[in-house]
Amino acid sequence: MDIDIIEEDENPMLHRTDVRFEVVHDEATPSRLSVRDSLAATLNKDAEEVVIHKLDTKFGMRKTVGYAKVYDNPEYARDVEQDHMLERNKIVADGEEEAEEA
């Protein structure tokens, strides 16, 4: 799976960078989590700082175009993002981490 960054837009007000990217894959469309991990590695960021919003694969193509928000800190992601987006990206809130450990 190869990831190419198409566009990066700084959003200093929300402490994030909006990223449009393209993924070329050999098999079926990769999962949201595997794309998130690969994009985080490409950008030298922690996976919890990356929130994948959209993945779009055209029928029959082995190319996926996506949109992600890359935060400066995981705390900013938890403060700004909606709960369902955090769930989809497996980003756990602070209160939930403590409940899981118990």
Curated annotation (Swiss-Prot):
<dbReference type="Pfam" id="PF01282">
    <property type="entry name" value="Ribosomal_S24e"/>
</dbReference>
<dbReference type="InterPro" id="IPR012678">
    <property type="entry name" value="Ribosomal_uL23/eL15/eS24_sf"/>
</dbReference>
<dbReference type="GO" id="GO:0003735">
    <property type="term" value="F:structural constituent of ribosome"/>
</dbReference>
<dbReference type="GO" id="GO:1990904">
    <property type="term" value="C:ribonucleoprotein complex"/>
</dbReference>
<dbReference type="InterPro" id="IPR018098">
    <property type="entry name" value="Ribosomal_eS24_CS"/>
</dbReference>
<keyword id="KW-0687">Ribonucleoprotein</keyword>
<dbReference type="GO" id="GO:0005840">
    <property type="term" value="C:ribosome"/>
</dbReference>
<protein>
    <recommendedName>
        <fullName>Small ribosomal subunit protein eS24</fullName>
    </recommendedName>
</protein>
<dbReference type="GO" id="GO:0006412">
    <property type="term" value="P:translation"/>
</dbReference>
<keyword id="KW-0689">Ribosomal protein</keyword>
<comment type="similarity">
    <text>Belongs to the eukaryotic ribosomal protein eS24 family.</text>
</comment>
<dbReference type="InterPro" id="IPR012677">
    <property type="entry name" value="Nucleotide-bd_a/b_plait_sf"/>
</dbReference>
<dbReference type="InterPro" id="IPR001976">
    <property type="entry name" value="Ribosomal_eS24"/>
</dbReference>
